[in-house]
């Protein structure tokens, strides 16, 4: 209607031509026009008006016309809308109208109106609405029950007609013909009515339920049915498709017409199934097992019937009667009895009949019944048949259940058109295939597009037009006081300058010199103690030093100094009258406990004495530091072992034996062996860092092996300025003992020694001596074959096994000897070499991994900028004037 408010009186005036004085619709034509107006109604007033008009209409033909035109569907739409909007008055009006309409089961199955009404009867908040809905539901249930009960009667009539036709061949034909004629008149009406009901009742659970409710005693039936079952099977074999129906009808019908009447209802169920699929369904529950088979077997009923007979004969044919088959769920009581055969017959009849359209059903039924009727009449016994028929009629209302093993469960879900559809379920595979093709095409196009994508702009860039903006109406900050405050503030602070380059290019590269990574050895050899090692000396050696334990009393300055001296020794050579470092230290220190470290620095001649010590060793000059240990390195204050100055200090041997006279032990522990024997004594070993020393007596045992480096057959180690170690010469064994004609090599300073075969090496500079000549520290001796090198004033001697040899020379008559280095000032420091009763000798590794001439390394930036480097002598770079000659 119009969008404005609607006056119901005006609406009724407009409809006056279609309505009577009482508001009832006059004719069928008027109801169709009113329905067309109802479809357009959107307002609640107009809808209620139309509903009242329908309520006032009493003529059944008008109401039926209203339903046929689509009024029932329209009411369903209005009911759904009013239920969603919870419009109670409109819901009540619609329910009253539905109650007034003559609805059938077919109408109720068309949509979900019945479902909505049932929901309202249970869940509605309004009590009156609930009552009204429950009344409507009960009314509809009554309609459903009445229709389900009427259907079997109609089936009976049809069966009787069929039997009459079939008995035209039999002598009893006249009785059946009369019945058939009487029912033939009723048939057309039933046919008209049935098409609707048949369609709606396709799954007809209503009938199934009604039959289930009507249970009767099944005991008598089995005995009489046995004979009928046998006959049926015979008939089936003769004519499989038609015989089955005929057998069902003929077995009971031949005996007597009244029996036929009772029996026909059972057969009518299959007939109805044949006529219309919908009708077939209601009786099928009784036929239980054959229902689905009948639907499936429609195209080839004969073949399927035979198969089913086989199945029924072993399982249900003998024990299951009519009801047993029809109710797959029902035949528990009668499985033992041979009744199952008759149910097989109706099942078979239903199966062939299901495919037949409703219009053709009567003709097909008649033909089928006539043919099997003749066959059935012969085998059926007249006396037993009438009883069976009557009982069968009764049994029609009885329910029997098969044995547990024969029970089958079927689920049938009827889809309501108005129900929600599962979207995920593929209904049309064609559509799914199209979607798949489209998705594949899309994926292919995107892949092709991406493969040719150069990440370049396809559209040329154009400079946008400049925007012409009107001058601002207000100058921003014109009245602001904060800008003046900020200006005053900026006068007293530094201006923030950001010197960003105007170009987007990378900044200029900073000068950078790659620094080799610092090597941090993981061995305990290089672990630096927090405090310098202090060795307590035991008295009892030959000749005690005047300072006693003075080595442990060195102040930090001297400790660093001695660390920098490295392998420097007092230059007391065979012909040298150099400065005695030991005496200078003694004069500086005085008595061991006389002065604290601070007072030593205040002595007037302190610096002069230090210069005297350092100048000969090149520590203050441009020359390289010989085997300089960094202050913090293993040879410095933290890692260096301080030995008391002065000759002959008693020293405990490494094995606990009495020590011989010792010289100043000012050298730190050697670096980790490189290529030789990795074993070396811990920081507590008094042998570490000093010359080989020990008493003239036999050594405790071969505990110490000669320290070996690389000898004549092996190339020297690659790193620059690593003190060469005593090594194998002449292919000596890897533990550092010289081979035949080779002497042990003593590690020296920075320069690589030049040796003859088996020559020994010292530290520092090179000096060429004669064969067997000795070398002081800081000099290189070039020995002849088997040449020897000693420490400062130390001599290497080699004697026969087990005895000490003379000092100052090494006999050449011993072809194979061990190399050992004696650096102590007195010539007594010789430990017998490995021999009979002789202790093992250790060749000393001179040199350190750091220190020496590093002028071939890059210059240390920190040292050049600040004048010092925090790594000091540990630094891996060149410090001019410290670990190499000063820059020119």
Swiss-Prot record:
<feature type="compositionally biased region" description="Gly residues">
    <location>
        <begin position="784"/>
        <end position="794"/>
    </location>
</feature>
<dbReference type="GO" id="GO:0004864">
    <property type="term" value="F:protein phosphatase inhibitor activity"/>
</dbReference>
<dbReference type="Pfam" id="PF08711">
    <property type="entry name" value="Med26"/>
</dbReference>
<dbReference type="GO" id="GO:0008157">
    <property type="term" value="F:protein phosphatase 1 binding"/>
</dbReference>
<feature type="cross-link" description="Glycyl lysine isopeptide (Lys-Gly) (interchain with G-Cter in SUMO2)">
    <location>
        <position position="262"/>
    </location>
</feature>
<dbReference type="GO" id="GO:0140767">
    <property type="term" value="F:enzyme-substrate adaptor activity"/>
</dbReference>
<dbReference type="Pfam" id="PF00642">
    <property type="entry name" value="zf-CCCH"/>
</dbReference>
<feature type="compositionally biased region" description="Gly residues">
    <location>
        <begin position="540"/>
        <end position="551"/>
    </location>
</feature>
<dbReference type="GO" id="GO:0032968">
    <property type="term" value="P:positive regulation of transcription elongation by RNA polymerase II"/>
</dbReference>
<comment type="subunit">
    <text>Component of the PNUTS-PP1 complex (also named PTW/PP1 complex), composed of PPP1R10/PNUTS, TOX4, WDR82, and PPP1CA (or PPP1CB or PPP1CC).</text>
</comment>
<keyword id="KW-0238">DNA-binding</keyword>
<keyword id="KW-0158">Chromosome</keyword>
<dbReference type="GO" id="GO:0003723">
    <property type="term" value="F:RNA binding"/>
</dbReference>
<feature type="modified residue" description="Phosphoserine">
    <location>
        <position position="382"/>
    </location>
</feature>
<keyword id="KW-1017">Isopeptide bond</keyword>
<feature type="short sequence motif" description="PP1-binding motif">
    <location>
        <begin position="394"/>
        <end position="423"/>
    </location>
</feature>
<feature type="region of interest" description="Necessary for interaction with PPP1CA">
    <location>
        <begin position="388"/>
        <end position="417"/>
    </location>
</feature>
<dbReference type="InterPro" id="IPR035441">
    <property type="entry name" value="TFIIS/LEDGF_dom_sf"/>
</dbReference>
<feature type="compositionally biased region" description="Polar residues">
    <location>
        <begin position="583"/>
        <end position="595"/>
    </location>
</feature>
<feature type="modified residue" description="Phosphoserine">
    <location>
        <position position="545"/>
    </location>
</feature>
<dbReference type="GO" id="GO:0008270">
    <property type="term" value="F:zinc ion binding"/>
</dbReference>
<dbReference type="GO" id="GO:0032206">
    <property type="term" value="P:positive regulation of telomere maintenance"/>
</dbReference>
<feature type="region of interest" description="Disordered">
    <location>
        <begin position="306"/>
        <end position="400"/>
    </location>
</feature>
<feature type="compositionally biased region" description="Low complexity">
    <location>
        <begin position="248"/>
        <end position="258"/>
    </location>
</feature>
<feature type="modified residue" description="Omega-N-methylarginine">
    <location>
        <position position="665"/>
    </location>
</feature>
<feature type="compositionally biased region" description="Gly residues">
    <location>
        <begin position="724"/>
        <end position="762"/>
    </location>
</feature>
<feature type="compositionally biased region" description="Polar residues">
    <location>
        <begin position="325"/>
        <end position="334"/>
    </location>
</feature>
<dbReference type="GO" id="GO:0016604">
    <property type="term" value="C:nuclear body"/>
</dbReference>
<feature type="modified residue" description="Phosphothreonine">
    <location>
        <position position="398"/>
    </location>
</feature>
<keyword id="KW-0479">Metal-binding</keyword>
<dbReference type="GO" id="GO:0000781">
    <property type="term" value="C:chromosome, telomeric region"/>
</dbReference>
<dbReference type="InterPro" id="IPR036855">
    <property type="entry name" value="Znf_CCCH_sf"/>
</dbReference>
<dbReference type="InterPro" id="IPR003617">
    <property type="entry name" value="TFIIS/CRSP70_N_sub"/>
</dbReference>
<keyword id="KW-0863">Zinc-finger</keyword>
<feature type="region of interest" description="Necessary for interaction with PPP1CC">
    <location>
        <begin position="393"/>
        <end position="408"/>
    </location>
</feature>
<feature type="region of interest" description="Disordered">
    <location>
        <begin position="247"/>
        <end position="270"/>
    </location>
</feature>
<feature type="domain" description="TFIIS N-terminal">
    <location>
        <begin position="73"/>
        <end position="147"/>
    </location>
</feature>
<feature type="region of interest" description="Disordered">
    <location>
        <begin position="147"/>
        <end position="213"/>
    </location>
</feature>
<dbReference type="InterPro" id="IPR000571">
    <property type="entry name" value="Znf_CCCH"/>
</dbReference>
<feature type="modified residue" description="Phosphoserine">
    <location>
        <position position="591"/>
    </location>
</feature>
<feature type="region of interest" description="Disordered">
    <location>
        <begin position="534"/>
        <end position="853"/>
    </location>
</feature>
<dbReference type="GO" id="GO:0010667">
    <property type="term" value="P:negative regulation of cardiac muscle cell apoptotic process"/>
</dbReference>
């Amino acid at each position: 209607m119009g969008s404005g408010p609607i006056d119901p009186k005006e609406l009724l005036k407009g409809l006056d031509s279609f309505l009577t004085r009482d508001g009832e619709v006059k004719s069928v034509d008027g109801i169709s026009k009113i329905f067309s107006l109802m479809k357009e109604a959107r307002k609640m007033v107009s809808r209620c008006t139309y509903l009242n008009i329908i309520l006032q209409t009493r003529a059944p033909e008008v109401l039926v016309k209203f339903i046929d035109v689509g009024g029932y569907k329209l009411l369903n739409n209005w009911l759904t809308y009013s239920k969603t909007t919870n419009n109670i008055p409109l819901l009540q009006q619609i329910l009253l109208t539905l109650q007034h309409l003559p609805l059938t089961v077919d109408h109720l199955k068309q949509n979900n109106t019945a479902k909505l009404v049932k929901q309202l009867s249970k869940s509605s908040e309004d009590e009156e609405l609930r009552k009204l809905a429950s009344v409507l539901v009960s009314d509809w249930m009554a309609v459903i029950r009445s229709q389900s009960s009427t259907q079997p009667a109609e089936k009976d009539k049809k069966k009787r007609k069929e039997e009459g036709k079939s008995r035209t061949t039999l002598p009893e034909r006249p009785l059946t013909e009369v019945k058939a004629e009487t029912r033939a008149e009723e048939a057309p009406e039933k046919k008209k009515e049935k098409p609707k009901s048949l369609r709606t009742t396709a799954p007809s659970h209503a009938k199934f339920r009604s039959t289930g409710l009507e249970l009767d005693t099944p005991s008598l039936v089995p005995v009489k049915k046995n004979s009928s079952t046998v006959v049926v099977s015979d008939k089936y074999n003769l004519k499989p498709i038609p015989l089955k129906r005929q057998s069902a009808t003929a077995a009971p019908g031949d005996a007597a017409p009244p029996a036929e009447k009772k029996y026909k209802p059972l057969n009518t169920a299959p007939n109805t199934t044949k006529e219309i699929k919908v009708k077939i369904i209601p009786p099928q529950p009784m036929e239980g097992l054959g229902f689905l088979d009948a639907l499936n077997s429609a195209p080839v009923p004969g073949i399927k019937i035979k198969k089913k007979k086989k199945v029924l004969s072993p399982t249900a044919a003998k024990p299951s009667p009519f009801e047993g088959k029809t109710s797959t769920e029902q035949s528990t009581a009668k499985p033992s009895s041979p009744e199952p055969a008759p149910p097989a017959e109706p099942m078979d009849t239903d199966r062939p009949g299901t495919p037949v359209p409703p219009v053709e059903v009567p003709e097909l039924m008649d033909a089928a019944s006539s043919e099997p009727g003749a066959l059935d009449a012969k085998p059926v016994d007249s006396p037993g048949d009438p009883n069976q028929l009557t009982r069968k009629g009764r049994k029609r209302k009885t329910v029997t259940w098969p044995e547990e093993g024969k029970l089958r469960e079927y689920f049938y879900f009827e889809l309501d058109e108005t129900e929600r559809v599962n979207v995920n379920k593929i209904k049309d595979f064609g559509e799914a295939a199209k979607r798949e093709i489209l998705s594949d095409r899309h994926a292919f196009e995107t892949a092709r597009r991406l493969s040719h994508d150069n990440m370049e702009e396809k559209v040329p860039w154009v400079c946008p037009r400049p925007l012409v903006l009107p001058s601002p109406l207000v100058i921003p900050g014109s009245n602001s006081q904060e800008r003046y405050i900020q200006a005053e503030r900026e006068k007293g602070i530094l201006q923030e300058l950001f010197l960003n380059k105007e170009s987007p290019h990378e900044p200029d590269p900073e000068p950078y010199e790659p620094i080799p990574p610092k090597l941090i050895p993981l061995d305990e050899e290089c672990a630096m103690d927090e405090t310098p090692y202090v060795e307590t000396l035991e008295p009892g050696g030959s000749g005690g030093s005047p300072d006693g334990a003075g080595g442990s009393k060195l102040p930090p300055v001297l400790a660093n100094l001695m660390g920098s001296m490295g392998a420097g020794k007092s230059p007391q050579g065979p012909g040298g009258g150099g400065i005695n470092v030991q005496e200078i230290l003694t004069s500086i220190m005085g008595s061991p406990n006389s002065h604290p470290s601070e007072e030593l620095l205040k002595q007037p001649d302190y610096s002069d004495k230090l210069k005297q010590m350092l100048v000969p060793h090149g520590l203050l000059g441009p020359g390289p530091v010989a085997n300089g240990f960094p202050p913090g390195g293993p040879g410095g204050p933290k890692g260096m072992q301080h030995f008391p100055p002065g000759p002959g200090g008693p020293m405990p041997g490494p094995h606990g034996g009495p020590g011989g006279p010792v010289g100043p032990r000012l050298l730190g522990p050697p670096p980790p062996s490189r290529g030789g024997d990795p074993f070396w004594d811990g920081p507590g070993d008094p042998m570490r860092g000093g010359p080989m020393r020990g008493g003239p007596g036999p050594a405790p045992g071969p505990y110490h092996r000669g320290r070996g480096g690389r000898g004549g057959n092996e190339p020297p180690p690659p790193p620059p300025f690593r003190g060469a170690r005593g090594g194998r010469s002449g292919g000596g064994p890897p533990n550092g003992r010289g081979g035949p004609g080779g002497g042990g090599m003593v590690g020296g300073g920075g320069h690589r020694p030049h040796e003859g075969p088996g020559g020994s090496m010292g530290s520092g500079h090179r000096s060429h001596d004669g064969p067997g000549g000795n070398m002081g520290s800081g000099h290189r001796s070039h020995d002849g074959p088997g040449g020897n090198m000693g420490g400062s004033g130390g001599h290497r001697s080699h004697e026969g096994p087990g005895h000490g040899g003379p000092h100052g020379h090494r006999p050449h008559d011993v072809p194979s000897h061990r190399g050992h280095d004696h650096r102590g000032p007195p010539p007594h420091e010789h430990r017998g070499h490995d021999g009979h009763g002789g202790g093992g000798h250790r060749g000393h590794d001179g040199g350190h991994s750091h220190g020496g001439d590093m002028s071939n390394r890059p210059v240390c930036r920190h040292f050049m900028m600040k004048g010092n480097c925090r790594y000091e002598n540990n630094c891996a770079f060149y410090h001019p004037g410290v670990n190499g000659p000063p820059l020119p």
